[in-house]
C-alpha cells in the first residue's frame, strides 16, 4: 500500500530519536499474514519483516470503534521472552479506513538511569480511550498468537484445554472470531492444533458463531 509506504522514512526517524530500546514497526493491513513491512530493533519483540499482524492490529481491522481514533498510547505490549513493553500506535488512513499502523514498543526493563526512564510516553498522563486490550501480544507466528490468546482466555476463566466441553470450545472460537483472528491465513488449522480438535470442528463452531451475528 503506497499510503503506508510513505511512512517508511518515519521508521528511520523514530529509531534515531528513541534508540535501541525502542522497537519501531510499520504495518500494512492489505496482507495481515505478512503485515510487518519494516521494523527496527526487532530484538525487542523477536519479530521481523514479513511477520503477521498482532492481536491488536486484527482487533483494529475488525472493530469499528477504532475508526475515529487518531492513535492510542500508554498501553502494555508483551515482547520476546514475556518482557513487558510500553506501547503506542498511530493509525494510517486512506480517507476514513485504517490501512496500516506505525507502532513504537519500548523495553523499559533495560533502562538504567532515572532520567532515561522519563520517556516520551510520560507525556501522556492517561491511557487513550477506549483501551484496546489489556495486553498486546507481539507474536512471531499465527500459531503463537492463537496459543497465547486461548491461554489468556482460559486462565481468566480458570480452565484448561483438556477440560473444555463443546460449549467452552465454541466460546473460545467466538472469542477468536471477535478479535479478528480468522482473518489470518491458516488460523483455523492453528486453532484446531491449540484446542486439540479437528479442523472441520473449528469450521463448524465458526459457522455457528457467525450465524449468531
Provide a role label for each language-model segment.
Residues 6, 84, 183:
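Short, glycine/acidic-rich beta->alpha junctions
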Residues 60-121:
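Sensory/regulatory domains in signal-transduction proteins
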Residues 165-213:
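Phosphate-/nucleic-acid-contacting segments
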Residues 37, 90, 180:
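Flexible, active-site-adjacent loop/turn segments at secondary-structure boundaries
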Residues 19, 155-158, 196, 211:
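Residue-level recognition of short, structured coil/turn motifs
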Residues 25, 122-125, 161, 183-184, ...:
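Secondary-structure transition/capping residues
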Amino acid at each position: 500500500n503506497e499510503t503506508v509506504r510513505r511512512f517508511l522514512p518515519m521508521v528511520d526517524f523514530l529509531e534515531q530519536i528513541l534508540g535501541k530500546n525502542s522497537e519501531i514497526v510499520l504495518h500494512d493491513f492489505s496482507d495481515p499474514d505478512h503485515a510487518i513491512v519494516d521494523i527496527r530493533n526487532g530484538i525487542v519483540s523477536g519479530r521481523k519483516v514479513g511477520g503477521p499482524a498482532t492481536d491488536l492490529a486484527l482487533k483494529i481491522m475488525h472493530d469499528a470503534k477504532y475508526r475515529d481514533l487518531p492513535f492510542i498510547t500508554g498501553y502494555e505490549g508483551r515482547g520476546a521472552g514475556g518482557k513487558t513493553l510500553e506501547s503506542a500506535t498511530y493509525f494510517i488512513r486512506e480517507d476514513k479506513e485504517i490501512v496500516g499502523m506505525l507502532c513504537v514498543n519500548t523495553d523499559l526493563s533495560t533502562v538504567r538511569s532515572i532520567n532515561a526512564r522519563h520517556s516520551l510516553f510520560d507525556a501522556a498522563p492517561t491511557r487513550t480511550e477506549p483501551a484496546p486490550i489489556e495486553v498486546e501480544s507481539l507474536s512471531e507466528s499465527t500459531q503463537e498468537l492463537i496459543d497465547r490468546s486461548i491461554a489468556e482466555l482460559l486462565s481468566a476463566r480458570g480452565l484448561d484445554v483438556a477440560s473444555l466441553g463443546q460449549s467452552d470450545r465454541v466460546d473460545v472460537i467466538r472469542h477468536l472470531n471477535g478479535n479478528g483472528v480468522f482473518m489470518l491465513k491458516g488460523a483455523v488449522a492453528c486453532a484446531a492444533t491449540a484446542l486439540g480438535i479437528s479442523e472441520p470442528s473449528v469450521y463448524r463452531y465458526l459457522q455457528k458463531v457467525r450465524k449468531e451475528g
